[in-house]
């Protein structure tokens, strides 16, 4: 038996460190030097992804990675549809951190809030989306997959060859997710492109419009979702902007949670959360408009009378219901047939299939992550049938739902198209998972330079001895002041946890409680015209912002005084186990504190 060699404590420590690094997937062995809680969250960079075998994708960050020991018993890979984004270099992250500490924030003018789609996507450039290459039934599955991978690598190579990483926004690098889009477009008779009304230009890729209306010859319906989060005049202005530039579009306004007329319109009530009214999904605004758009497209080729009858029943039920709670609405109504299409994206089915087959119209719902695709389906059905989450990438694969025997809905996973948007704006749009952001401070600075965050949250400058004195603010100061106000401290040193505070501010922005709305070109000059537009008045009445309150249950507002509730929301988002709604602003109904978090009613010392 060989003699045992001495093994020092230092060697043992190094062995354990190497073992932990291997488990975390760190190839370079770098570890964060920070001893704070924020440093522990930022310490990992994702493993280099070379699964596609090309140098174009050698700096890919894989988000929502699930622990897996290989394929499951049925050959299912839980990480097959995870988000793939280009990874920021460590030098770039450190540079942005320094800028967040040093750069003084200056408010921008209203003209800088105007977004032109030609500046974001540059139609006609290489900022396109990957198309499924030509194929034939004589090809095997392996040949088809190999051809698609080569085509996808060429697509990525053209984009990265034309633009530097600093100019490009985050966009999807996972071929499996693009295959889901191909399948949805091939099986759909009508395509719904869902966008967020706060920044619809961000969610509207012109290349998809040209492909759907031109090459496929399908009707495209643009859904401006979450209209309760924007002023009615701005909603009408965006509607006319898209009608003017894309005449083949059918534009529909939608929200799953119409604003209650008794909800105060005070922008300073950021920390107020409204209790959700009962039968919330049946109150969705927009199903009637969507039905009229589909009737104009199908022109009698499909019998949609059952859909109209369903909408009438939902409206009658919402009027009759006494708001007894969400449990009641989950049980009401007929069952909805759900089909999970986990591997259908790999099937070689062409887009030339029969339209309105068997008298059924298939409506495909596509769009960016976190724009409310799943919430829209719940609003159309009238109750919760689709799991929704604030975390982008929650929908892993497309599913089909029969709204009525003649109407089939198809929910596609969210996809990020390549553009030239600032990455900070993408974070504020909810495209990137907030819990996995390496450097959230510049996004906070981007937000604070466009809306008065300090005034809305009543923040006190961390270096101010006199509260009435004026001090210059930087993004780091705002995060530190919010951490002090909320009591966010690091675990060991009890310093202000600025990383957690920055994440909290970004969640408020994504949820709509810190609402940042962008405008179409020329809106600032014509704001008065849009405010007096007849469609604006009609939308105000439709949303229920004016008029009698009605015989509904009273709503209560409770202030977010406990940090435990917000921490619970953060954990649910990070683990992707939360099934909260994608829209939870002040104006939207929200469930009670006790219902959302059993620890929210405890005092600060009991958490």
UniProtKB/Swiss-Prot annotation:
GO CC, one annotated term: nucleus
Biased composition (Acidic residues): 550-584
PROSITE patterns, per database record: G_CP (PS51721)
Residues annotated to bind GTP: 225-228, 367-374, 411-415
Region (Disordered): 1-81, 547-607
Chain positions with Phosphothreonine modification: 48, 50
Keyword list, A-Z: GTP-binding, Nucleotide-binding, Phosphoprotein
Ranges of compositional bias, category Basic and acidic residues: 15-26
Family note: Belongs to the TRAFAC class YlqF/YawG GTPase family.
Protein's UniProt name: Guanine nucleotide-binding protein-like 1
Species this protein is from: Homo sapiens
UniProt gene name: GNL1
